[in-house]
């Protein structure tokens, strides 16, 4: 049935022309290309763009447009996924060769790209830590803050993230890879050999500093060092009160005193003619080596909450002993110390500790412990409920050296639903969009996406199908530690949670603690109580600031999808070579197996599962589905008769089209979203994408669009009748078409046909009409033409009525290119009918190019004795090749 038959009969202005427009194609097609007819139909259907004085509609029943964005929905009961131990085998390529034999060059290249993956952008912009967790849910800011921090710590515990310890050190959990062994500092609590050697050298230099000090005169040394100790104690107490204890200031004061002592005693290092500048440098380097050695010796210790009075007294006694022992044996202050400073008698107590860089870090949440509550909803009541809140931070099993990693982030994070159909679980979104914007953007590599015709050519067969899903596929691929400074995420901590207040202001009244007291509201208090019920003592760890870098491939970078496609396609290629009787292909994290019988498919599945598990690749058992003869893939149902969309997409389109209001100007954002939904099913309709050309025009003009009742009912009728996309056949071309602006010609193996147009047409339009006539009169599924526009199959650039009818006529037709000099229909199109001559032999190759799904099946290499033996239950020994 003609797609426009009902529509033309309902248009009153076309009553006299309906029979002619629906008549023979050689008469109707040139008329459909006329500009006047297209304008009259557009007027009847009200497809012209409306005037600007009309008020636009920004929201329909199912689709939102401009100025009506839906607020994100936060689920307080989100279940965070549990990640298994995702660790690929260290010698992955060698292990694969044991199972699948020698790898091809392409397979090796793809695996080497991913093991490890590398990411080095042109420029990286760093953001303050306060932007680490995006305020995506303003009404649930605190709950989202702790849920996101807990998600990041869960990824760290699974070995997916590095934890930044200082500028040059990272720690993580799990087994180190071979490239991480070269940067090892500590493994399972034991120092690595190379790191131990450097520590011994530093200890020797530190001992030389002690020998130098013992040569100093006892009187001047004792007096000066006593003054030095008192000076440092005064400065540290002062900085403790203001919250600005500077370890660099202590180092500078100590070096100045040591320089004065040495110069006053006229003791020189090395030669007698050394200058005071050389002396100062020598003492400075000795002091740095002593301090570094001391830091390394205490590096394994962690600060832990112990709030008992005995511990406080012990810390005070240690402080008193340290300050009184003026000529002590060591010259660097302890890096983990506690001091009590009472700005008001017996009220406030601040705990200050220095990290491995020497910068002060304060556990402000602990500062509430010995302070008076500011009200009924003070955080003090929650903090004082437990004596031991656990450590402020943790250290992983492995510590490695890294490039300089700043105390900044490169992208924010937030949580969303796992997918539109699963709102009970959460998914982490990493916002690394800076690498895709601006003049320093990264040009990501392109990877092949399977189109609809290719899927039909490969998979439209009568096989038994099984689909597998790789669990957390992106997190299987490791990334080089050198890329960590470019992929940083983190949390600002609870003390910086309230972004309205500036955390950089300091005064003598404990401004940071006062900032924490600003959080003491009823809402925050009740939320923290509920969060404590969820996280327990871990709430203290989540409240601390931290910075993490990705150890595995993140999903928020454009490089990730390309690398994952390379990785899974290499695996599919190896399995395909070793099981020539089955079909194996992969797209992203989906792996599909096809075999002739279910028994054969079961045997392949069990073998692949055991091999992948040994390699460290985890499959999601819950998402493994046996489809039988109807494969569900990428939203399509693929059978031996062709490809059709799934029922859920068809029902969704019907619901959206019915909800569209009639005779109201809809803004272009609604048109964009509606067109995106309709485009998914458009290839299965009679008129294809050409039916949506009026919507395309409104979107390109950024204007409103008015749906008339006729156009809406016509779209509904189109999307109610769907036709499958069938497989292409490898046949020889026997029909050729050509045209001139005034005539057309068709050549077959047994006859030559020609004709003329009633009026001159554009050459591309004339060529398209000639191809339609050849398809109607010969029924050939393969046509030869010399016009590139017709060969492309994109008909949306033609007049609307002609494009719709041509899509209907040429549905399921393939084209092959023939040069004009060799086109046998060239002379008939010019009005000449020469004698028949042999046609050029052109054979159609079904479209399988630019796709990473299917690997060719070259001869399988001889199996090595160490490989797994597997015998196919299929009786025939000939390899099965997709059509």
UniProtKB/Swiss-Prot annotation:
Phylogenetic lineage: Viruses, Riboviria, Pararnavirae, Artverviricota, Revtraviricetes
UniProt name for this protein: Protein P
Control of this protein's activity: Activated by host HSP70 and HSP40 in vitro to be able to bind the epsilon loop of the pgRNA. Because deletion of the RNase H region renders the protein partly chaperone-independent, the chaperones may be needed indirectly to relieve occlusion of the RNA-binding site by this domain. Inhibited by several reverse-transcriptase inhibitors: Lamivudine, Adefovir and Entecavir.
Listed EC numbers: 2.7.7.7, 2.7.7.49, 3.1.26.4
Region described as Polymerase/reverse transcriptase domain (RT): spans on this chain: 387-728
Reaction(s) the record says it catalyses: DNA(n) + a 2'-deoxyribonucleoside 5'-triphosphate = DNA(n+1) + diphosphate; Endonucleolytic cleavage to 5'-phosphomonoester
Residues binding Mg(2+): 469, 589-590
Family: Belongs to the hepadnaviridae P protein family.
Pfam family, one: DNA_pol_viral_C
UniProt GO MF annotations: DNA binding; DNA-directed DNA polymerase activity; metal ion binding; RNA-directed DNA polymerase activity; RNA-DNA hybrid ribonuclease activity
Renumbered residue ranges of the record's region Spacer: 184-386
Remaining remarks: Hepadnaviral virions contain probably just one P protein molecule per particle.
Domain Reverse transcriptase: 397-638
Source organism (scientific name): Woodchuck hepatitis B virus (isolate 2) (WHV)
Its biological purpose: Multifunctional enzyme that converts the viral RNA genome into dsDNA in viral cytoplasmic capsids. This enzyme displays a DNA polymerase activity that can copy either DNA or RNA templates, and a ribonuclease H (RNase H) activity that cleaves the RNA strand of RNA-DNA heteroduplexes in a partially processive 3'- to 5'-endonucleasic mode. Neo-synthesized pregenomic RNA (pgRNA) are encapsidated together with the P protein, and reverse-transcribed inside the nucleocapsid.
The UniProt record lists the keyword Hydrolase: yes
């Amino acid at each position: 049935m003609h797609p426009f038959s009902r529509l033309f009969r309902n248009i009153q202005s076309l009553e006299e022309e309906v029979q002619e427009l629906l008549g023979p194609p050689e008469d109707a097609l040139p008329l459909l290309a006329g500009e006047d007819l297209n304008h009259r139909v557009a007027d009847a259907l009200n497809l012209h763009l409306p005037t600007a004085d009309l008020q636009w509609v920004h929201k329909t029943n199912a689709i939102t447009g401009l100025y009506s964005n839906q607020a994100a929905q936060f689920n307080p009961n989100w279940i965070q996924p549990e990640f298994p131990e995702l660790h690929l085998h260290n010698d992955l390529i060698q292990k694969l060769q044991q199972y699948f034999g020698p790898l091809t060059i392409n397979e090796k290249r793809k695996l080497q790209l991913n093991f490890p993956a590398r990411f080095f952008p042109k420029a990286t912009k760093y953001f303050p830590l306060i932007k680490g967790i995006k305020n995506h849910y303003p009404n649930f800011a605190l709950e989202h803050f702790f849920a996101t921090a807990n998600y990041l710590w869960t990824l760290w515990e699974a070995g997916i993230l590095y934890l930044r310890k200082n500028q040059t050190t990272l720690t993580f959990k799990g087994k180190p890879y071979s490239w991480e062994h070269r940067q090892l500092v500590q493994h399972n609590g034991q120092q690595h050999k190379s790191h131990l050697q450097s520590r011994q050298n530093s200890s020797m230099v530190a001992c030389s500093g002690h020998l130098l000090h013992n040569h100093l005169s006892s009187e001047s040394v004792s007096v000066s060092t006593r003054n030095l100790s008192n000076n440092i104690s005064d400065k540290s107490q002062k900085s403790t009160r203001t919250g600005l204890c500077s370890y660099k200031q202590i180092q500078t004061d100590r070096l100045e005193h040591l320089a004065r002592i040495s110069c006053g005693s006229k003791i020189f290092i090395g030669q007698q003619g050394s200058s005071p500048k050389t002396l100062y440098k020598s003492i400075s380097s000795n002091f740095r080596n002593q301090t570094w050695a001391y830091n390394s010796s205490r590096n394994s210790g962690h600060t832990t909450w112990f709030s008992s009075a005995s511990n406080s007294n012990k810390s005070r006694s240690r402080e008193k002993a340290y300050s009184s022992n003026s000529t002590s044996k060591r010259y660097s202050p302890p890096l983990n110390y506690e001091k009590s400073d009472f700005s008001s008698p017996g009220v406030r107590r601040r705990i200050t500790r220095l990290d491995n860089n020497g910068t002060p870090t304060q556990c402000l949440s602990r500062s509430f412990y010995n302070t008076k509550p500011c009200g009924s909803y003070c955080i003090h009541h929650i903090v004082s409920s437990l004596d031991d809140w656990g450590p402020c931070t943790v250290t992983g099993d492995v510590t490695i050296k890294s490039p300089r990693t700043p105390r900044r982030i490169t992208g924010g994070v937030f949580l969303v639903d796992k997918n539109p159909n699963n709102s009970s679980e959460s998914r982490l979104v990493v916002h690394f969009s800076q690498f895709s914007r601006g003049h320093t953007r990264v040009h990501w590599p392109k990877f092949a996406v399977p189109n609809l015709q290719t899927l039909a050519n490969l998979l439209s067969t009568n096989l038994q199908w099984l689909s597998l899903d790789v669990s957390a596929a992106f997190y299987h691929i490791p990334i080089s530690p050198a890329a960590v400074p470019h992929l940083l995420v983190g949390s600002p901590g609870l003390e910086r949670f309230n972004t309205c207040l500036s955390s950089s202001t300091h005064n003598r009244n404990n401004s940071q603690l006062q900032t924490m007291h600003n959080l003491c509201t009823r809402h925050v208090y009740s939320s923290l109580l509920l969060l404590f019920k969820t996280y327990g003592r871990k709430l203290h760890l989540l409240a601390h600031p931290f910075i993490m870098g990705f150890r595995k491939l993140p999903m928020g970078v454009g490089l990730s999808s390309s690398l994952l496609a390379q990785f899974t396609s290499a695996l599919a290629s190896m399995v395909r070579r070793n099981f020539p009787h089955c079909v194996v292909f992969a797209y992203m994290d989906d792996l599909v197996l096809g075999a002739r019988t279910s028994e054969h498919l079961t045997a392949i599945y069990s073998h692949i599962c055991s091999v992948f598990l040994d390699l460290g690749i985890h499959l999601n058992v819950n998402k493994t589905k046996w489809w039988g003869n109807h494969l569900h893939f990428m939203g399509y149902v693929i059978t031996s008769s062709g490809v059709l969309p799934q029922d859920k997409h068809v029902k969704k389109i019907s619901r959206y089209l019915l909800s569209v209001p009639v005779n109201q100007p809809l803004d272009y954002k609604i048109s964009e979203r509606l067109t995106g939904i309709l485009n998914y099913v458009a290839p299965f309709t009679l008129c294809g994408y050409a039916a949506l050309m009026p919507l395309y025009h409104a979107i390109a003009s950024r204007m409103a669009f008015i749906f008339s009742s006729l156009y809406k009912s016509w779209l509904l009728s189109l999307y109610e009748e769907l036709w499958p996309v069938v497989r292409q056949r490898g046949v020889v071309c026997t029909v050729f078409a050509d045209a001139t602006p005034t005539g057309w010609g068709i050549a077959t193996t047994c006859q030559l046909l020609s004709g003329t147009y009633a009026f001159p047409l554009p050459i591309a339009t004339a060529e398209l009409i000639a191809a339609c006539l050849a398809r109607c009169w010969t029924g050939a599924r393969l046509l030869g033409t010399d016009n590139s526009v017709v060969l492309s199959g994109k008909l949306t650039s033609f007049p609307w009525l002609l494009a719709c009818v041509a899509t209907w006529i040429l549905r399921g037709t393939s084209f092959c290119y023939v040069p004009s000099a060799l086109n046998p229909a060239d002379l008939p199109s010019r009005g000449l009918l020469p004698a028949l001559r042999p046609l050029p032999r052109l054979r159609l190759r079904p479209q399988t190019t630019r796709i990473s799904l299917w690997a060719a099946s070259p001869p399988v290499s001889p199996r090595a004795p160490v490989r797994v033996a597997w015998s196919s239950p299929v009786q025939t020994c000939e390899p099965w090749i997709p059509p």
